[in-house]
């Protein structure tokens, strides 16, 4: 399982290469193999020329690509992406989503958590949760998959918090 965090969670005093090596250290991968694997992962996300940079020397989109490289380093079949575009501008969000779509086309399962319906409908399947319960599980392109813009603003029912009985 590879995990992509919303806030990147890069270690500020480690280089990009060292950040991507972290899960490989915990997996007991020998140093030379760890270095080669991390370098290849950074090259895969277009950052092979910034191996020695520190995270604070990068844009938000570049930091998210490092987080993606770290998630890919162990070659997981499943990638869990928690709001991977939440802290990014729209252009960079499209780039990151494109990378995740490419990973899916290459055979990875990508589980993407989002509150953004415009992102969710790009998936093949949507599982929507409300109050911890599954309220929809199906084709992302089915009419019932689309959340109405005002769904969060529904009027409370009589007797619920904020209303008078």
Residue locations for each model-derived region?
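Conserved beta-strand-loop-alpha-helix hinge in the C-terminal portion
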Residues: 133-158
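Short, flexible helix/strand-to-coil boundary loops that buttress conserved ligand/catalytic motifs
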Residues: 123-124, 138
């Amino acid at each position: 399982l590879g995990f992509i965090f919303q806030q990147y969670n890069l270690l500020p005093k480690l280089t990009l290469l060292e950040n991507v090596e972290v899960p490989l250290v915990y997996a007991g991968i020998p140093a030379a193999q760890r270095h080669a694997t991390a370098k290849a992962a950074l090259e895969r996300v277009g950052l092979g020329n910034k191996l020695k940079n520190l995270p604070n020397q990068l844009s938000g989109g570049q930091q998210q690509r490092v987080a993606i490289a770290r998630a890919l380093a162990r070659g997981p079949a499943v990638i869990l992406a928690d709001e991977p575009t939440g802290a990014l501008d729209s252009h960079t969000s499209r780039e990151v989503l494109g990378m995740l779509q490419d990973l899916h086309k290459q055979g990875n399962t990508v589980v993407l958590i989002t509150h953004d319906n415009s992102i969710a409908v790009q998936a093949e399947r949507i599982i929507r949760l409300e109050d911890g319960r599954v309220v929809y599980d199906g084709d992302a392109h089915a009419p019932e998959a689309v959340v109405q813009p005002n769904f969060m603003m529904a009027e409370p029912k009589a007797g619920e918090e904020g209303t008078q009985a």
